[in-house]
Regions:
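Helix-boundary/low-complexity linker signature
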Residues: 1-191
Length: 191
């Protein structure tokens, strides 16, 4: 009995040593990134009351280059679950479909070209203030590389998210196309 156990143990050790590779094991999960999931981040509306109540007199961020009448967008929500507004996850074209930033986003946009220079102050979080149909986002400062690698854009809604979070002092430039706006008088009678 004991001799059989010794032989089996030696055989098992020999097989294990012969089949163990000298090189480390490579698996896809080490190199393939999971898809971006916007639902990991709180809706920008969840912070809205805090900004209105606690930062009423504070400068949240500064934008230079914004054309007159253009609006800053922090997020675009198209779903409501009875408690909170959020982005939907209805696939391509939905407000939950984000992809990594790149040059030449929103290539077919029409309107007036503008370059916005944005500096963060009291505003912090993942939702990136922008305007219009963004074609390029360029970060500055010591966190520029981390912000660039962790920023995603939704071309359908014009919304951007920086997963490494914006902080006071962060700066970025946005090349964008501001769409034409219409007055009520211009639209009257067109329906």
């Amino acid at each position: 009995g004991a001799a059989v156990l010794v032989v089996a143990g030696l055989a098992g050790t020999g097989v294990a040593a012969a089949t163990t590779l000298a090189e480390p094991r490579h698996v896809f999960r080490d190199v393939v990134l999971p898809p971006f999931d916007v639902h990991q981040y709180a809706s920008p509306l969840q912070s809205y009351r805090g900004y209105v109540k606690d930062h009423r007199k504070d400068t949240l961020f500064t934008v230079k280059g914004l054309p007159e009448g253009a609006r800053i967008r922090v997020g675009t929500m198209d779903a409501y679950n009875g408690v909170v507004y959020d982005v939907s996850d209805k696939g391509v074209g939905s407000s939950g479909a984000f992809s990594p930033i790149r040059d030449n986003m929103s290539a077919g946009a029409t309107g007036s070209a503008a370059t916005l220079d944005v500096t963060m102050d009291a505003y912090t979080g993942v939702w990136l203030p922008d305007a219009g149909a963004v074609s390029r986002i360029t970060f500055g400062g010591s966190d520029a590389d981390a912000l660039r690698r962790g920023t995603y854009y939704n071309d359908s809604t014009g919304t951007a998210i920086a997963t490494s979070k914006l902080r006071k002092g962060d700066t970025y430039s946005v090349d964008t196309t501001i769409p034409r706006t219409w007055t009520d008088k211009q639209l009257d009678g067109l329906a």
